[in-house]
Amino acid sequence: MTMLKDPSKKYRAFPTIDLPDRTWPSKTITQAPIWCSSDLRDGNQSLIEPMDSEKKLRFWKTLVQVGVKEIEASFPSASQTDFDFVRTLIEDGHIPDDTTIQVLTQAREDLIARTFESLRGAKKAIVHLYNATSPSFRRIVFNQDKQGVKDIAVNAAKLFVKYAAQQPETQWTFQYSPETFSATEMEFAKEVCDAVIEVWNPTPEHKIILNLPATVEVSTPNIYADQIEWFCRNVSRRDSVIISLHCHNDRGTGIAATELGLMAGADRAEGCLFGNGERTGNVDLVTLALNLYTQGIDPLLDFSDIDGVRKVVEECNQLPVHPRHPYVGDLVHTAFSGSHQDAIRKGFAKQQDGELWEVPYLPIDPADIGRSYEAVIRVNSQSGKGGITYLLEQEYGISLPRRMQIEFSQVVQGETDRLGLEMTAQQIYSLLHKEYLQANAPYALVSHRLQEENGHSAVEVEVAGEGETTLHWRGKGNGALEALVAGLPIAVEIMDYNEHAIGAGTNAKAAAYIELRVAGGRPVHGVGIDENITTASFKALFSALNRSLSQQEAKAA
């Protein structure tokens, strides 16, 4: 079978919502929603190999550490393992006073009774009831009409009241999800939810949660936002209801749908860390939170050690986080492109502590989430001088002059083309060392003696020449470098000179860079590094001289 030429014969567009006076497009998110993690329930049930109790407890502790205050821990009536995990959390004191455990149940009395039993002794708990309400589920799965589906929800809601009354020591919060809400007729979704509200009788002081899932994402996120705004306007007792979102990512827009849903009036968001969950996953709470953070809004979740959180999630879920995953992927703060690297390097150079973050191509400061700058710029065949320069500056304190950046980038480019691989900072430094600092033929500086007389410098250098010969060159000039040039047996024009310190204190070294031209040839650079600045400048001159002579010899051959 192949894709249809006319997909309209098999698929139909989702209907839009008639809401001409919608207000959500002109609104912005100004505060974090109530967060609820479903990693241990929705996320866990979607794993090839569900977590054992040890992994679940490790994951629970990570969620608590991050700051998630409502955590859906399990489906206690589904298995003894899930039931026992809830008991472990309660009996062993793993639920902090500011954290609420949430559990899920279907709308059957035996399952509801078992669910409440699992929570015995909890200080506070959210019990989550659901049943599907969309036309396809009513017709295909349950063979029920609207009244039948509504009755299921109402009867189960009454059982919640009954069993909660038997455990008055617990502070109960009831939650209802019209599963497949986003594919349900809005009037009917409201009708069912209103009926549940009447049974539970919430107040502004003791609210219930209505969770409105995009169980399967079926439309563009603007339609979901319209549904949420319509529902918030029309549901009864809105001041006594927390509107919660539960988006999946079937169309790849779970983040956008959730954010637009919050703009449309929702108060709460359920999801999983890094987007685990059924099929294409639940909405990613980490991305949602850091999207807020990068807009200057406190997300009320702490991802200062995002790689530590990722390690726990990957080991517990036994699923890798994609290298391009927002904020946490291995490559999301990495630039290979030369123009990107140059912009980032310049951005870092201008960025000051305490100022608004404005580094190009980096929407967040990697340091805020525990990332180093080491991987921000990496060098391959697509890279330019900016990335190479940045790595040498950051890792080795070497600041190449601009024209030398261009020259050395061509050397690196040739090496990456030859290897077909990325180059690390260490490999780039090794290439710099080989190309410039080891350029000691045909002339190698052995020693030098410098004298100052009447404001002039006199230099004598001992040089190892070809064939194990020893040469002595002498020169005078206004400075040490000019004196050395005067003593060379070859006509040399110094075109540029730069120097800087590497490090500080007694261990500091000097780096010198010379651009010169030999006998009318093309400009060539040299580098010298030494504890003594004069020696460093002499080494740089010999480096450039030898490179120029070697290039002329190679060209002549």
Swiss-Prot record:
Q: EC class of this enzyme?
A: transferase
Any one GO molecular function term: magnesium ion binding
Q: Which reaction does it catalyse?
A: 3-methyl-2-oxobutanoate + acetyl-CoA + H2O = (2S)-2-isopropylmalate + CoA + H(+)
Keyword flag Cytoplasm: yes
Q: List the residue ranges of the region (Regulatory domain).
A: 439-557
Q: Which Gene3D superfamilies match?
A: 3.30.160.270, Aldolase class I (3.20.20.70)
Q: What is its EC number?
A: 2.3.3.13
Regarding protein family, the annotation reads:
Belongs to the alpha-IPM synthase/homocitrate synthase family. LeuA type 2 subfamily.
The job of this chain, per UniProt, is described as:
Catalyzes the condensation of the acetyl group of acetyl-CoA with 3-methyl-2-oxobutanoate (2-ketoisovalerate) to form 3-carboxy-3-hydroxy-4-methylpentanoate (2-isopropylmalate).
Q: What is this protein called?
A: 2-isopropylmalate synthase
Whose protein is this, by species? Pseudomonas putida (strain ATCC 47054 / DSM 6125 / CFBP 8728 / NCIMB 11950 / KT2440)
